[in-house]
Amino acid sequence: LDVSVQAQVVNLLGELTEELGLTLLFIAHDLSMVRYISDRMAVMYLGGLVEIGTSSEVFFDPKHPYTQTLIASNPEADPNHERNRQSTTIQGEIPSPVNVPAGCRFANRCPQAMAHCSITTPVLKPVPTTSEDLQSQRLVACHLYD
């Protein structure tokens, strides 16, 4: 969809969720749009959840290295900031989604990987939240938070 039609669809979805009290599962690669339309966000890598939290928390304080890279790769609206921004790329080969490697799915591409990341699969676990919502739960699947 072109940008104007995309914005109209997203605005309509937002209005419908408010007016009708709907819950949506919105799957997208555009994290800015996800942040705009959703209250909570989940980030996946190779079919596995790596981070869950409020959209603001995940977008402004990403915990998982993959989420950090995704957020950093979003283009800046200000052309001066975009021009001066350092390039963000993920090194390494993408593992096969059919033959998922042992341990953390992101380990071979993670700049912060430790030896046990390639052996032990991290599970989603709570990390401190910055949300004022007492019902908010922030979860991250990363050995950095063991």
Q: Residue ranges of each PLM-predicted region?
A:
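Charged, flexible cofactor/metal-binding loops and thiol motifs
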Residues: 54-146
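P-loop NTP-binding/switch modules centered on Walker-like glycine-rich loops
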Residues: 1-83
